[in-house]
């Protein structure tokens, strides 16, 4: 959807079988606001969910699995919430980039593996909350690069290569009450 307002994308099964050079995104939102993306299953695409310049949108109870790149690729999109989604076996995991005021709660990021893969990447993101998520069996569990004033609380990071990579350009974060179990680093 492009330049859409107050629409609902719900209860769909969207399967792809493309290769990286030809595959598109399953659900692609651009310059949209007040959207609801709920109860979808997407697999086999370039990116399962791709959002750019999206505002005030709720992403809830979706499954994004076996995509070539990202389960979710999210940029320049403010005031959005991600709750109770499952991101499984994607090529690179989930990337939330260049944004602020995001809530990421009670999601599962699992088995996103590869040379540049992570469960969840927070890049140049601020004033956001990551709470109650399960981040398990990823190359890197949680990578924070250029993230500031984040609250990372009550997450479980288990059986990842690196549990948490926090880069030096990520100041003023609160990381508390998390469980780290069985990670390599």
Regions found by a protein language model. Give the residues of each.
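Extracellular beta-strand/beta-solenoid scaffold signature
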Residues: 1, 20-31, 44-50, 66-73, ...
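Short low-complexity stretches enriched in small and charged residues
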Residues: 48-52, 58-63
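Leucine-rich solenoid repeat scaffolds
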Residues: 166-185
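Parallel beta-helix/beta-solenoid
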Residues: 3-4, 9, 27, 31-32, ...
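A compositional/structural signature marking long, glycine- and acidic/polar-rich segments
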Residues: 126-165
